[in-house]
């Protein structure tokens, strides 16, 4: 039975176990890294942003993460029209909490990192998330060289987001605290090569995947997301499953006009031998019936024997129907988003 948490409180008890598992419409759990039990290398923390321009048919993503063994910094540019992706990443080893990622997604914070190839700065101030990231040497799908993004994502104070806190049946000291913030209207500029372009009002939307946890060694997950306008109203989806005990909380929800409309279990039906074929996504209550058509696979593979990762983040379009809890049926027609299959041994 899923459990909605409504009061703020500490995430972990003195033994390192979640005090109240469930889901919430706001980030209510107080995360303290020093309270995590089971070794610092098992702690995984990340801020992942994706901004998708529905009108101009492109997406950009930026990641800053502390995975214990290593810190990963990554930038990608997805061109839906050319069906191509450009990406660049960098690793540093044994960051162990030194990057400066925040202990709460709603606190004001600054985190920055740079090397000779990449530079990042994520700044949170009130209702605005200022993202500055660049890769001057990135060769884009159209042949131009260099990507420089300066975006502001607007997260209204009254907007709801989906936060879950769950643990693993086999190891209750292993936990996953995660917030997905959809439908953040994006402003700012993007420079591709020598061409700079201002985002137009309402054409681009951002999503934040804010994750903190103490993980078990091997996991596979599935995640799907989109943020757009449907009949001129902000609409989003966050769907996912695959790891930890989701009895008290799934991370499945419709975002509509900045409010959470909670869903139960969902299932992704796809050809594991060819992820570029259509995916069929449904829920058990009959509220979702979606076709996801991938157009490009942002894939990466890492194998250091002890640490192994295989990631397929597919960008494409969603079509189908979503039924709100009040009975209203919304029709989606080619809205851009993504779905992913990720395996990690870390």
Residue ranges and their predicted role:
Residues 1-346:
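Structured soluble/peripheral alpha/beta segments that form catalytic or ligand/cofactor-binding pockets
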């Amino acid at each position: 039975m899923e459990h909605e948490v409504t009061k703020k409180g500490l995430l972990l008890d003195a033994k390192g176990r979640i005090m109240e598992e469930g889901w919430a419409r706001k980030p209510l759990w107080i995360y303290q890294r020093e309270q995590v039990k089971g070794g610092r290398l098992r702690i995984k923390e990340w801020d992942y942003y994706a901004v998708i321009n529905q009108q101009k048919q492109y997406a950009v993503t930026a990641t800053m993460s502390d995975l214990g063994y290593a810190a990963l910094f990554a930038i990608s540019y997805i061109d839906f029209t050319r069906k191509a992706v450009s990406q660049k990443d960098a690793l540093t080893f044994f960051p162990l909490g030194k990057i400066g990622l925040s202990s709460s997604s709603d606190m004001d914070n600054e985190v920055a990192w740079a090397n000779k190839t990449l530079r990042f700065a994520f700044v949170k101030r009130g209702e605005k998330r200022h993202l500055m990231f660049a890769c001057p040497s990135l060769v884009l799908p159209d042949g131009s060289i260099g990507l420089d993004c300066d975006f502001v994502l607007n997260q209204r104070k009254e907007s709801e987001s989906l936060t879950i806190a769950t643990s693993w049946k086999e190891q209750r000291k292993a936990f996953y605290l995660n917030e997905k913030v959809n439908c953040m209207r994006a402003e700012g500029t993007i420079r591709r090569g020598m061409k700079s372009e201002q985002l137009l009002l309402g054409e681009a939307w951002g999503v934040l995947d804010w994750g903190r946890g103490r993980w078990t060694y091997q996991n596979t997950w599935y995640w799907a997301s989109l943020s757009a306008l449907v009949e001129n109203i902000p609409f989003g989806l966050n769907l996912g499953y695959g790891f930890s005990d989701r009895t008290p909380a799934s991370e499945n929800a419709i975002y509509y006009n900045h409010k959470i409309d909670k869903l139960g279990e969902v299932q992704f039906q796809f050809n594991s031998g060819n992820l570029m074929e259509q995916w069929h996504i449904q829920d058990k209550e009959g509220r979702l019936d979606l076709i996801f058509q991938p157009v490009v696979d942002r894939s990466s593979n890492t194998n250091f024997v002890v640490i192994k990762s295989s990631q397929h983040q597919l960008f494409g379009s969603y079509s189908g129907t979503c039924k709100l809890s009040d009975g209203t049926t919304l029709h989606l027609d080619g809205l851009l988003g993504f779905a992913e299959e990720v395996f990690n041994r870390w």
